[in-house]
Amino acid sequence: MGRSRSRSSSRSKHTKSSKHNKKRSRSRSRSRDKERVRKRSKSRESKRNRRRESRSRSRSTNAAASRRERERASSPPDRIDIFGRTVSKRSSLDEKQKREEEEKKAEFERQRKIRQQEIEEKLIEEETARRVEELVAKRVEEELEKRKDEIEREVLRRVEEAKRIMEKQLLEELERQRQAELAAQKAREEEERAKREELERILEENNRKIAEAQAKLAEEQLRIVEEQRKIHEERMKLEQERQRQQKEEQKIILGKGKSRPKLSFSLKTQD
């Protein structure tokens, strides 16, 4: 019992440490992604600010130039101060330049305040987004931790389902291969049977032709034997006839037998 408990505790510690390492790596990757997003947003914001500043400068410069033109067109050549003295054009130009510089300073300060406010708003927005993202990540981790067993069961179920599907597909593939092999074997057997039948037919035809040739040869041999017998009989008959004639001739020559003719002699008288 003690050994099993120690083994289970070591397994659980190893599992917890591996899960902790996985969580730490996920949090590090998320922090790196956040830092990259923050840097990109800052660079985009700085570009927007520079464009805004350039537009505002050009706008203020154009406005100052237009004001100077209007003042030149509307201002009289000389002015009189409160004491009735004529004010020279030089002093009026100095006042205009001073007023324009003050307006430029005021515009620059206003633009600076606007930029400062935009930067502060952007920082607040980024901090809010960061906190929201951290809160969402924390909630997601908590939810994943709560649903860990359910997720593991779902993963195991999907793995088992995929395994069953793969086993089924493998069995179907093996069955298709077996059927294909059976069909190929059947086709080979059918082809061999057809070849065997063709060979048997050819052999039968050859045997029939050989039998016919042998029968014709036997008939021809019988005919030759019969002709030879007839010739022999004819020879025998001729030989017997020749012998008979020879005997007859011998009998005639030797005078044997009744068949010898009588000789008659007669004398004729002369008148």
Curated annotation (Swiss-Prot):
Residues 1-112, 236-271 are annotated as: Disordered. Residues 66-82, 91-112, 236-251 have a biased composition (Basic and acidic residues). Residues 1-29, 37-58 have a biased composition (Basic residues). High expression levels in the neocortex, hippocampus and thalamus but low expression levels in the midbrain and hindbrain (at protein level). Ubiquitously expressed with highest expression levels in the central nervous system and low expression in uterus and pancreas. GO terms for biological process: mRNA processing; regulation of alternative mRNA splicing, via spliceosome; RNA splicing. The modification Phosphoserine is found at residues 58, 60, 74-75, 264. Induction: Post-transcriptionally regulated by autoregulatory feedback loop. ARGLU1 protein binds ARGLU1 pre-mRNA and stimulates alternative splicing to produce two alternative RNA molecules. The first includes an additional exon between exons 2 and 3 and is rapidly degraded by nonsense mediated decay. The second, a stable intronic sequence RNA (sisRNA), retains the entirety of intron 2 and is able to bind ARGLU1 protein preventing it from stimulating alternative splicing. Residues 73-271 are annotated as: Necessary and sufficient for transcriptional regulation. One of its GO terms (cellular component) is chromosome. Keywords: Chromosome, mRNA processing, mRNA splicing, Nucleus, Phosphoprotein, RNA-binding. It is found in: Nucleus; Nucleus speckle; Chromosome. A motif (LXXLL motif 1) lies at residues 170-174. Residues 1-72 are annotated as: Necessary and sufficient for RNA binding. Dual function regulator of gene expression; regulator of transcription and modulator of alternative splicing. General coactivator of nuclear receptor-induced gene expression, including genes activated by the glucocorticoid receptor NR3C1. Binds to a subset of pre-mRNAs and to components of the spliceosome machinery to directly modulate basal alternative splicing; involved in simple and complex cassette exon splicing events. Interacts with MED1; the interaction is direct. Interacts with PUF60, U2AF2 and JMJD6; may interact with other proteins involved in RNA processing and splicing. The N-terminal region can bind RNA; preferentially binds 5'-CGG[AG]GG-3' motifs. This is Arginine and glutamate-rich protein 1. The gene is Arglu1.
